[in-house]
A protein has these predicted regions:
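Conserved GNAT-fold acetyl-CoA-binding loop/helix
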Residues: 6, 23-50
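A short beta-loop-alpha structural element at the N-terminal edge
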Residues: 6-20
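Hydrophobic adenine-recognition pocket in adenosine-nucleotide-binding enzymes
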Residues: 10, 86-88, 121
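Conserved beta-strand in the GNAT
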Residues: 60, 66-74, 82-87
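A conserved beta-turn-beta hairpin within the catalytic core of GNAT-like acetyltransferases
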Residues: 75-84, 93, 113-114
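Conserved acetyl-CoA-binding loop-helix of GNAT-fold acetyltransferases
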Residues: 88, 94-107, 133-134
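Conserved GNAT acetyl-CoA-binding A-motif
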Residues: 109-121
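Conserved beta-strand-loop-alpha-helix junction that forms the acyl-donor binding cleft
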Residues: 119-129
Length: 137
């Protein structure tokens, strides 16, 4: 199967696609992590995403020009970074989209001399914990 896969910086016109990716990815995350649906992501709006596009680095993964994944990273004043809003559409899991997004963020952070990176995830979602662990977190 041949397909085109790219990762690029997101722009304001991507905000709705980012919102849709995270909405679908979050539904899956809540089920797999066995957590309460009232987590903050549920209330994020397209306007919130547009604001983050101005203050954080936001990347998108696309397969055949279809948005499939997204990730945000903010470099803090102490030269650490925080990864947030990382999600891949469930139908694109396990084909490398998430790993590629993390690797792009990793290269971005290295180029900015960031030495420590933080993220949060549910410890009850064992596959995701293993995913992060295998990537060096």
């Amino acid at each position: 199967m041949n397909y085109s896969f790219i990762i690029r910086k997101a722009v304001e016109s991507d905000a709705e696609a980012i919102h849709n990716i995270l909405k679908e990815a979050f539904k899956d995350y809540v089920i797999r992590a066995k957590i309460d649906e009232t987590v903050e992501l549920k209330t994020e709006t397209i306007e919130d995403i547009k604001k983050d596009l101005q203050t954080k680095e936001v990347f998108m993964g696309l397969i055949d020009n279809v948005p499939t994944g997204t990730i945000r990273v903010a470099i803090q004043d102490d030269n650490t970074a925080y990864i947030s809003r990382f999600g891949v559409l469930p139908e694109y899991h396990n084909i490398g989209v998430g790993k590629a997004l993390i690797k792009v963020v990793d290269k971005f952070l290295i180029s900015n001399q960031v030495k420590k990176v933080f993220l949060h995830t549910a410890s009850t979602y064992k596959e995701l914990v293993t995913f992060y662990y295998n990537l060096g977190f």
